[in-house]
């Protein structure tokens, strides 16, 4: 019940009320806003000069030397040493030659905050040992796997799988013992470099170049491992739906809103495979704009059903943190649970389905309901 209005008995008070005027409106704002300074000075990594790559790399094998620079700088230098020509590509992409120092150095009246020279006066020009080269391989292997899958956190979670890939590569290079002993950089994690590279506008072009270049040995063996990881990386929705359509044995497939999106999914994926051919499995890794056509929002009901099924059937998906029911979906989890109780037939006669649903089910080998 609204509060009663208080009666004003005082004549002066009544007069004051009659004379009340609302405050004047605020003056119009000019529309200006705080601006970033031109050529912002946020600390950034660098790659040094091309002629110094090897000497910089030798110096940065030492942890005390690495600690002097931006945490991403050593990883970029190791990559430039690993792949000749990458330095020029990085420069073209806007990567600075100068790296910020972790702590500014004062020399007389001058304070140095960044430099393109990463080696010291005592750093000798020498060839790398085989174990040093393998250690750089190991670091860059983890780094590039993190780049193609788009996440440093997945590198931390899948450390054992990455070690297995590195051991496989070392065995292919006839240096199986290095799979265990190439540990000179094991305390230098590539996680910050992964996140930095993944934040660059050229990351997709970088990955595409790696995947489409014919490298000589040992680059071929190295990239073979990267390609295995890059295949269908960042395409979880696509791979989950494909597995669902091929292996699901319950009637969630026949829910009308799910079934109609199956037809759409098959059409879109077939068109993308035709357009991109051998590059189709790498659309996610190279950040191709067409990858969004296979995102959950394109097939929200089908994706919801696929994630629901996969979380029930696939132990590796049990910890998948994304919501089961995708934005834009009309199917409900209770509906999926109800349809899951009934099985479908594949290759054998079963209870007949309605005409349009039946035609869609035949596309994925479903012949009826049990």
Curated annotation (Swiss-Prot):
This is Nucleoprotein. The keyword Iron-sulfur does not apply. Pfam families: BDV_P40. Changing residue 362 to K: In strain: Halle B1/91. Residues 1-25 are annotated as: Disordered. Keywords: Capsid protein, Helical capsid protein, Host G2/M cell cycle arrest by virus, Host nucleus, Host-virus interaction, Modulation of host cell cycle by virus, Viral nucleoprotein, Viral penetration into host nucleus, Virion, Virus entry into host cell. The keyword Lipoprotein does not apply. It comes from Borna disease virus 1.
């Amino acid at each position: 019940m609204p509060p009663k209005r208080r009666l004003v008995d005082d004549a002066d008070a009544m007069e004051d009320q009659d004379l009340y005027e609302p405050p004047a409106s605020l003056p119009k704002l000019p529309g200006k806003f705080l601006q970033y300074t031109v050529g912002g000075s946020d600390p950034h990594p660098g790659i040094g000069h091309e002629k110094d790559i090897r000497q910089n790399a030798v110096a940065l094998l030492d942890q005390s030397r690495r600690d002097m620079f931006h945490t991403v700088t050593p990883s970029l230098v190791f990559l430039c040493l690993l792949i000749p020509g990458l330095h020029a590509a990085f420069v073209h992409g806007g990567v600075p030659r100068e790296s910020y120092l972790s702590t500014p150095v004062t020399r007389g009246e001058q304070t140095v905050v960044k430099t393109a020279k990463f080696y010291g006066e005592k750093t000798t020009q020498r060839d790398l040992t085989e174990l040093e080269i393998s250690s750089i391989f190991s670091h860059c292997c983890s780094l590039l796997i993190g780049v193609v899958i788009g996440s440093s956190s997945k590198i931390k979670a899948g450390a054992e799988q990455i070690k297995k890939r590195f051991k496989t590569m070392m065995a292919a290079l006839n240096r199986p013992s290095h799979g265990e002993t190439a540990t000179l950089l094991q305390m230098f994690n590539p996680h910050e470099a992964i996140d930095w590279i993944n934040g660059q506008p050229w990351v997709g072009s970088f990955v595409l170049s790696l995947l489409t270049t014919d490298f000589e040995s040992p680059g071929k063996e190295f990239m073979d491992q990267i390609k295995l990881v890059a295949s269908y990386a960042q395409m979880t929705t696509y791979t989950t739906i494909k597995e669902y359509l091929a292996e699901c044995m319950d009637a969630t497939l026949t829910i009308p809103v799910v079934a109609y999106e199956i037809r759409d999914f098959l059409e879109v994926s077939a068109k993308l495979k035709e357009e991109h051919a051998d590059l189709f499995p790498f659309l996610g890794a190279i950040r191709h704009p067409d990858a969004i056509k296979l995102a959950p929002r394109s097939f929200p009901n089908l994706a919801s059903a696929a994630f629901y099924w996969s979380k029930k059937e696939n132990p590796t998906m049990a910890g998948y943190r994304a919501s089961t029911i995708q934005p834009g979906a009309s199917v409900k989890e209770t509906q999926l649970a109800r349809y899951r109780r009934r099985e479908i037939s594949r290759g054998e006669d079963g209870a007949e389905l309605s005409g349009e649903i039946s035609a869609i089910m035949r596309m994925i080998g479903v012949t009826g309901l049990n």
